[in-house]
A protein has these predicted regions:
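Inter-lobe coupling/hinge segments of SF2-like helicase ATPases
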Residues: 1-172
Length: 172
């Protein structure tokens, strides 16, 4: 078992040390996250960013390759020139991470390019669009966890899973 609460609680319930409760419905007024899988498309990315900014929200752009984050920032700046963009990843020192997160929370940034550092523990209710670049490099449970960073209020949330153009999307 890990140190996370779910396995510990499950172990306690199965061992009869604790009762098991089930949550079968989402919180009242909670909407399902609309998830789209797409190849990189400047128009789709621009539209998703502009829709969120126009309604006063913010965006996570997950890009798990720290070496190329600055080139992604440049590319996003060209797609949406008025965007205020921050960068957060685990190779920053703690003070820099905290500084960048505070700027994002205080709405100095419209979008933050980040690594999977956001996977757990963040609950910023104003962030309701997440774009996950190169989603094929993540596991399914990791994608689900990262996607869960949005949609934490009654506001409609969107998740865009970006795959490289060289892969084909088959219809189900």
């Amino acid at each position: 078992l890990t140190a996370t609460p779910i396995p510990r609680t499950l172990n306690a319930a199965l061992s009869s040390f604790r009762d098991l409760s089930l949550i079968e419905t989402p919180p009242e007024n909670r909407k399902s996250i609309i998830t789209k899988i797409t190849e990189w498309d400047d128009n789709i990315i621009r539209d998703s960013i502009e829709r969120e900014v126009d309604r006063g929200g913010q965006i996570y752009f997950v890009h798990n390759d720290i070496k190329t984050m600055n080139s992604i920032k440049l590319k996003l700046s060209m797609i949406s020139p008025k965007l205020n963009i921050g960068i957060i990843h685990a190779q920053l020192d703690n003070r820099a991470i905290e500084n960048q997160m505070n700027k994002f929370i205080n709405k100095e940034y419209d979008l933050v390019i980040c690594s999977s550092i956001i996977e757990s523990g963040l609950d910023i209710t104003n962030v309701n669009t997440i774009i996950i670049n190169d989603c094929h490099k993540f596991g399914l449970s990791q994608l689900h966890q990262i996607r869960g960073r949005v949609g934490r209020t009654s506001r409609q949330a969107y998740s865009y899973l970006i795959i490289p153009n060289k892969y084909k999307i088959s219809s189900v």
